Amino acid sequence: MSQVSEFILKNFKYTIRREKQDVGNLIGLPYPYTTPCADECFTEMYYWDTYFTNVGLLAMGNISQAKNNTDNIRFLINKYGYMPNGNRTFFLGATQPPVYFKMVEEIFEQTGDRIWLSESCAA
């Protein structure tokens, strides 16, 4: 295994945040979510970043966290009618390229979970 892969596997857990309640301008999410880096300067998830994080999670076999991330995006889509740039109130006026259904497709390809697919497509 390369040193880069080892570093990612060892430190990935530090990118996971759990904040179910709104705090200041941070929008709480129902499931644990990943942020762009391990240090505390980012406490929010970002739409585009989360897609690429999920690609890595699926490659590492961490389907459950990829589903958590995608379920959080579905939560925000259902709440606001679209996925904001991230889960902060000051991101509500912007979004990023639409990758939600690509995330759903990639998870479904690995799991075959038709119930989850149906729930995800209802967003």
Located regions from the model:
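Acidic, mature catalytic/reactive cores of soluble proteins
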Residues: 1-123
